[in-house]
């Protein structure tokens, strides 16, 4: 079977020897017995017990592997405190064997980065192993529905994913320590390169934001691969030392901190609809607060905590203004009075004056506070929705040129429309919905045509990120919780597509996809498209993305093993003789550990081994080499009565989510003008041909045509005119087909060529041939007798 072959190709041999995988072959034998004896109730029990036992073994292995990776990352983080500015050759084994001792040695930044890459590589291999086990269990349960009479019934089958849940083993702490290591390495390299330290992280920046941002969905299986691409370049940005806090409290560490927002709208959801329509000046008003890190109660808010009053205004490009977000802070106890219009802003102004704020800043504050309050009262806005998530931000201090945020555990909660006479609902029984993916937002501050960093281009184009432009938590929450009501006239384009599988293992790399597939449907359209534009792959990868390579080294596994053995060696030495120096320790122990440290030859496996196996055996859920429809339309579901804004949604190559596109009218007008030019010339040729047929006279041919057959002498003008009409009709058909093919390509907005490859070439050669033949005929008539010496030439 394809999955069986793909599974054998996807496993890591070294992990398999350690018992890291569900044994699919043994489980498949049980499934075959179930298929042969379909009514035997004992077989599902046998399968369940077998899966549970194997999951227990895998969970134990995952637990030990996470501890090993944490030990490695912690040792590297301690060693990164002793980075040297000089790239002097160092024995890494000696450095890591002395970590934590008084004789710790300095580590060059390049070696620290190399070890961090090795740990990242092993961590991603662990994630791939875990994901393959999940895919295996899902495949087994799916086959049970085919072979068992009633399928996997009972609560135990529903909860099998919760038993020995290896996904619950957090790797956030490992990513945090690796982020710290990369940050130290980048700081040392920056000091050596520029002679000055970089901007410290965690510094509070401006409160006015003006960025271009792109949002992506990331499946939770693929999130570690995205984080691993970010931390070598951007450190985790936090306002508090959450890692130290988690150690003090004895609670698990998480990369993100809770963020909650309460959105305001009226009974008819006016702001929601204006936001979806992308009207110029569309406004969004919300109250946002930042929860305490590591606190399980995200709704907890004390009276002295700050709540930010925020307003977001959308502006179209033609208006000359940029969309912006502005905000100011109030204490929680003052929010209700502010919304009612009973709060005096004089104390806030006095506080600004005490901080030596300029008159312009004071005026901006008053203008913003008045604008938000005016809109709340003018549109009768009420609290309608609350969004909550864990946000991890990656940014280099005050440098906001690149900022990446990752929102996980996103949930949307219904508010009470102000019935409690409070700015937010404090009850615990509100309707709630969880968003299935992580939301990654890449925020850039750069000029329109400025080239961004290659690693950013590689990240934005990798298959782990599913681009969903203009994704809005507020729009998603309203459509999810209120989409069935008659007040919602339209829903966002992504709502009918939430069930699409966006896992990276089920789709090829963007730059490896043939962008011409799927544009045309039917044999005729495909044939004409390939005749006009060719069949070769287009350049779908940007120059910057092609320059960036993730984990380019080929010795990551060997480096990992060497450092791991050095750390174990140091731990053993410290446990045997903690008070002895390395020179005083027995030589027999040194020799024994040196022998244990000798490495066997290792193979560098790919971190995307599972994806390559799925690709080789065509385990994609969609047809990758056939033709899908160009447009997506909703055919059912609870949003069937609502309009999917806006209209038909074109299919973007290599991506699962189809995104509405905006088209520049000049693009389509240029294509039409191209067709009109060809049609104009074809019409002239056709009219001349018709005139030759109607008014031509073959009797007026030159005297040297007298010897021609009488039929051709009588009908030469008809033949000539007919040929001209046929040529004109062919040119008209060609112009129309080219126009339609180019329009489809413009509509699909793909990175492929729009130019006509064969038409101009053929036209050029035809004109050259006509000119050459004409010149040759005139030369032969005038100089032929002289050159040949014959009057009959």
Swiss-Prot record:
Disruption phenotype: Is considerably less virulent in mice. Reduces short chain polyP levels and results in accumulation of PPi. The chain crosses the membrane at residues 685-705, 718-738, 761-781. Residues 586-595 have a biased composition (Basic and acidic residues). GO terms for biological process: polyphosphate biosynthetic process. Residues 1-684, 739-760 are cytoplasmic. Residues 706-717, 782-793 are vacuolar. Mn(2+) binds at residue 441. CDD domains: PolyPPase_VTC4_like (cd07751). The SPX domain has very high affinity for inositol polyphosphates. SPX domains may integrate inositol pyrophosphates (PP-InsP)-dependent signaling to adapt cytosolic phosphate concentrations to different metabolic situations. This is Vacuolar transporter chaperone complex subunit 4.
